[in-house]
Amino acid sequence: MCRPGSRSWLVAAVVGLLVLAAAGGVSAEPKLRVVVTAPFDASGLEREDQWMGEGVAQILSLGVAQHPSIVQIERGRLRSAAGTDTLTEPVLTQAARAVRADAAFFGRIERRGTDLAVVPQLMELKQSGPEVTSLEPIVAPSAELFGRLATLPVTYVRTLHVSTTDAEAARIEKAARPTRVPRAFELFSRGQISAFRGDQEGNEAAVDLLSRAVEVDPSFVVAAYMLGVVHSSLGNRWKAAAQFRAATQLDPQYPEPYKALGDLYLSQPRRLFDQAVEAYSKAIELRPFYADAYVGLGDAKAAKSDIDGAIAAYQKALVYNPVNPRVHMSLGKIYYGEKGLYYEAVNAYKKAIDLDPRSVDARMGLGEVYEEKGLYKEATEEYRRVIEIDSKHTGAMYNLALVYEKVDPKAAIAQWERYIELASPLATEKDWVDVARQHLRKLKNQVKD
């Protein structure tokens, strides 16, 4: 039997049930626009000023997050789809299509005499091909530039012909001006660049830069929140929680740190589910269209066995963000695990993979279905793909060894040895390593005989 996935089956089942319920005709009005935001090309600037390209992207992301009709694709998915950090227009077009965006925000920054010019562009991905619109450049002295960019997110939204009230525009502009201290914003942007690297060194550099941003501007709530996010990525739960709480005190109306606290509570060994529900609910109170907070709320209620409450939360999450591949992955789990519906499960997993080809959870689920149905060739392909994406994915290495036992004992021996070498130093893999060694001894004896 293959190893069970690391995600809670109950949560996955609830999400699947939600999608079944939602399939009856939930429609999102007004129409949602799915967008990606790329760092602006600042390669023509001096090296010490090239952080500004990320700075513009941050302003856009912070601003449009305030609009209920804009769904933003995470930067990590965009980078994975692109396969590079250099997002030229052709690369951006291909990557945006891959993540199912229908628009992309991008552009460049150039020097014009003593001023800087931000030259924004909008790409709409239509069936006939990409259509690029050039927006009015914003030209200003360096010290004044980022203060003038607060109107840019609204310009993008209205160029997309998305209805925007005066109150929404004011909320967007306020969010797009997260600090009035230029040096603090520079440190914040540099910190984001480091954090996007996703490795230990990058996160540690981000902690230093974001800490300095908060020192320069103690009221910079977004920097305080992001410092907590990076601490969480480094496994520093207590420091992360302290930063999130500090952010809620700096600005009690800012929902992101409440959602982040919910994530921390939900993942605590002490099972702080009630506190998670409270934190997610507060985030939703502050931003009623906060899709990720609804997902967290659904997870927390499912963990409390409040199935009806979980379904209602997931329903809201789908209304505000219907392009989440996790939905289809969860459908695959419930189709096969609960109902034994093989074809429906395979189709659901394939849909999740179509939306996010690098989803190791969906590929693991599909591989497990194939394996249990005796389709060892197909299972092998999925587990190998997971290992290509994440060479240290112990679950895929373990399951691949099990499949090889059915078809090629010698290959299984080699795979078990690779798994044991990788997993032995990991405390979380101890029991699995013990089982693997038993399999390995048995196989070696069989091959001898």
List the predicted regions and their residue ranges.
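Position-specific recognition of the canonical hydrophobic site in helix A of tetratricopeptide repeat
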Residues: 195, 232, 259, 266-268, ...
